Amino acid sequence: MTQKAKNTIYLLILIILSMLCLVYASVPLYSIFCKVTGYGGTVRTTTVTQSKLGKTTIKIRFNADINKELPWKFYPEIPYTTVKPGEQKLIFYRAENLTNEYVSGMAVYNVTPYKVGKYFNKVACFCFTKQTLSPYQKTIMPVSFFIDQVYIN
C-alpha cells in the first residue's frame, strides 16, 4: 500500500471519528445554547436576587401535559398567577403515582410564546431533576420563578 493510500485512509478515519464526536456532542451543546439564549422557549435558570419591581402585571398560565405511558396524575395547583417583572413567585404542581410500583419521570418545560422564554427565569424547579414516586405516592413539587425586568422594555 502506498503512502498516499495510507494517508487517505487515516484522513477518512479522522473524518468519521470527528463526525461521531460531533453527533455525540450536538445534543448537550444545543441544550446549552437554548438555555443561554432562551431559544425555542427554553427558560433560563438563575440564582439572581430580586431587583426593583416593575409596575406592569403579567398573567402566567401553567400547563401540565403528561406522557400517556406515565401512570401519574400531574397538574398545577393553580391554573394561573399574576406577577410583576422582578417579583419572585412560588407555585406548586401536584403529582400522584397511580401504580403499585416505583415510577420515575422528568418534566420537560417550555414557555410560549417562544420569544418570551428568555425572560422567564426559574430559580428552583422540580423539573431540573428526575422525580421518582413510590407506589401510590402523592407529592407537591415547587417552582420558583421571576420575569426579567428587561421584558417590560
Swiss-Prot record:
Q: Which Gene Ontology terms of cellular component type are present?
A: plasma membrane
Highest taxon in the source lineage = Bacteria
Mapped to this chain, the residue ranges on the Cytoplasmic side of the membrane are 1-8
User: Which Pfam families did the record assign?
Assistant: CtaG_Cox11
Keyword Transmembrane present in the record's keywords: the answer is yes
Record's subcellular location:
Cell inner membrane
* Periplasmic side stretches: 30-153
Annotated keywords: Cell inner membrane, Cell membrane, Copper, Membrane, Signal-anchor, Transmembrane, Transmembrane helix
Task: Please give the biological process terms from Gene Ontology that the record holds.
Answer: respiratory chain complex IV assembly
Query: Topology versus the membrane, per the UniProt entry?
Result: Single-pass type II membrane protein
Molecular function (GO) terms for this protein are: copper ion binding
Main localization category: membrane
Residues of the signal sequence?
none
Where would you find the membrane-spanning parts of this chain? 9-29
Family per record? Belongs to the COX11/CtaG family.
Its annotated function is as follows: Exerts its effect at some terminal stage of cytochrome c oxidase synthesis, probably by being involved in the insertion of the copper B into subunit I.
* Protein name as catalogued: Cytochrome c oxidase assembly protein CtaG
